[in-house]
Amino acid sequence: MKNVINQLYWDRMSETYLYGTAFKKNAKNEVTFKNKLMPSGKTLISWSSIANYQVTKEVPSLPLLLNGQEYLLKISAKIKPENSAIFGIHFFDIQGNEIDKVIFTNLEQKFKYPTRAVKYTIKIISGGVEEINFKKIQISPLDLEEEVFNDFYPHPIYLNKNSQKEGLILLDDSKRARIIAPFKIESYVGANLIIGYLSWQNKQRGFELLKDYIKEHQDKKLVIFSSSADIDKSLENFKSLNCTVVYSEDFVNKGYYNLQETYLSKNYRESDQVRMVKKAINYFEE
């Protein structure tokens, strides 16, 4: 089973409260919402797991969830005044009746998807909000470790404490999800292998964490494998560090490394992590 962190953004203008609102969105899909006169109790924005395409011409904005499974919802946002936003997760049955809800004001919340639910919505409601600087909401299975949400997350797929070699495969997150490799390698491959996931929305912070990771692993013969031309550019600043870099043109095919994905890209890609791991294994066997 894949461990998937679904990521959603403030991209539903039809569901946004605009009366008297100053609204800004940048290329990273980060939103600034300002409205000092908005009455308490009004909904700033809502998302739904089901949409009537013929009416709204929009697809559902929330991922499908499994009945009876527990999840963690994390909100990346700064709210002024603090704790003045009220968040609600509402669950509905097949008749459209609300069967349960979770209301909270903190930026992290556990919840269980009811067994009878066929739809859910997420809302941000004003409790005296004047400004929100909003990045994203992340929804994941509850049992994932906390570090998996970081802007750079190193995920080991093969570890041998006696090996002095290490391969680190760098992957950009998809705009809609971070998909953690659902496999481990059992047999010896000549080096420790790690897949490093980089946030597309906050890549600068991700590379700062990557530099710290490299310094912490200076006792290893570290080889970094790049999977995109965009990562190649950032790795140009790593030449002074004690590591070897295999750039994307030598690691993946040209059609892939030239495919630069942004939030508004028409092309959707999911990294072929199995193929990249095989390429890294071959590198250490040569």
Stretches found by the model and what they are:
Residues 1-286:
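Extracellular and organelle-lumenal recognition/adhesion modules and their flexible linkers in secreted
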